[in-house]
Amino acid sequence: MKLSFIASPVWALALAQFAAATQVKIDVDVAIFGGGSAGIHAAIQLRDAGATVAVIEKKSQIGGHAETYTDPQGKSTNVGVVVFDNIEVASNYFARLNVSIVRGSPLGTAGPTYTYDFTSGAQIPAVNTSAEAQQQLTAALQSYSTNVLSKYPWIDEGFLVPDPVPEELTIPFGELAQKYNFTALMPTIAMYNYFTGDLSTIPSLYGIKGLGQGALKNLFGSFILPASGKTRDLYDAAAIELGNSVLLNADVVKVQRDVRINSTTTGVTVLIQQPGQPPKLIRARKLLVAAPPTLENVGAFDLTAEERGLISKFSSLGCWASVANVPGLNVTLKNYGVHMPYNQPSIPGPYGFVAYGSPNNFLVTVGLPDAANTAAKGEAVVRQSLATLSAVGAVPADALEKLTFPFSAVHSPYSLRVSAEEIKAGFYSKFLALEGARNTYWTGAVWAGHNSALIWNFNMGTVLPGLKKDLGL
């Protein structure tokens, strides 16, 4: 049979009519694109308000970066999201899903810790904990709180950048640290926010976002952790709650907005395909985009020129998280960038090999300069680091030969950001003005930072009030 015959107009029309006839139609109030932290939290809140939802998730499970690996002996570790800010929106959410919590610090490791520059192999002496160093840190904390955080009380609510944009939010964060004399705090910020990019050069808006009021309080106090130690518990509970409202392994084929979904209502249609199933056409009154807004992710959308222009401004880093099995290694090794500002691990590079109590298994997270080929690049970086450490005797000589990865996860694109020039030109005000336009709302880490509690804050304070109002809830 000739392909030209199948491709004729008559056959094309027949095939289109057949595809439409076999579609499964789903009518809901809100279609949610992305089943990570932002999308699942919003889904629960909307259901509680009486709305129907359909969560569209491309992976085989919900939860985004919240991954938990359990070894054959039953020892678990979180590979991605580890803790939650100890604020009301987080404790309320855990309570809503009946997931027990504890409060504490996750910064300890199992067994002794040694520090090396993973690039050169140089071993680093213990951190200075003298009284003078502590005084410098205390003074830096006070200055940061008084001169920076007090001026930007909205920082934990989202990128609610005012217009006009304060000039100091666009200068390099290292310059802001010098201006207000909180340089002694910068290594702590680097530790809490590894893989930010060069902390000395990123726009100050992003540096401040990484250590807002809530995080600062928790860093020197306590965080929320699931009582079981498994961050997956939150999403396992949510999955039970949402049931068949979650559509997994779903590829979005086409999204149309401002279209007639019935005789009286204008809304959105989302055509998805799942393996081994007929296509599904979701007809919704509103669309909530909770996945990273990259041109790749929203390629099936009917984007306006304005939306496409704004989304194209984003750049991102890459992040690869894994459990590495290194036989013979029984200590934690932390990466210390000798030649990096504030001694951040250089990118590309791992944060370290962090022991968590499972013999020979280590949590290893790698930062990359971009999101392309994350898994292959991440593994290569770990192997290069082990080769360097092996050469100086920090790990067994055969570590590289015996290295395996029983678990890994791609967390790219990571940390979507725009340039200082775009911030100055009002990028965030322009994008926030699109909330609700064309029956579409936007949420996620790109608006709140890679911090689940702050994402939920953004949902509760900015996204859900407008969305519920539009739905008449």
Curated annotation (Swiss-Prot):
It comes from the Eukaryota. SUPFAM superfamilies: FAD/NAD(P)-binding domain (SSF51905). Residues 1-21 form the signal peptide. GO terms for biological process: terpenoid biosynthetic process. Keywords: FAD, Flavoprotein, Glycoprotein, Oxidoreductase, Signal. Glycans are attached at residues 98, 128, 181, 262, 330. Its EC number is 1.21.-.-. The keyword Acetylation does not apply. The keyword Signal applies. Pathway: Secondary metabolite biosynthesis; terpenoid biosynthesis. Diterpenoid pyrones display various biological activities and higginsianin A shows anti-HIV activity. GO terms for molecular function: oxidoreductase activity. InterPro entries: FAD/NAD-bd_sf. Its cofactor is FAD. Belongs to the beta-cyclopiazonate dehydrogenase family. FAD-dependent oxidoreductase; part of the gene cluster that mediates the biosynthesis of the diterpenoid pyrones higginsianins A and B. The first step of the pathway is the synthesis of the alpha-pyrone moiety by the polyketide synthase dpchA via condensation of one acetyl-CoA starter unit with 3 malonyl-CoA units and 2 methylations. The alpha-pyrone is then combined with geranylgeranyl pyrophosphate (GGPP) formed by the GGPP synthase dpchD through the action of the prenyltransferase dpchC to yield a linear alpha-pyrone diterpenoid. This is FAD-dependent oxidoreductase dpchF. It comes from Colletotrichum higginsianum (strain IMI 349063) (Crucifer anthracnose fungus). The lineage of its organism: Eukaryota, Fungi, Dikarya, Ascomycota, Pezizomycotina.
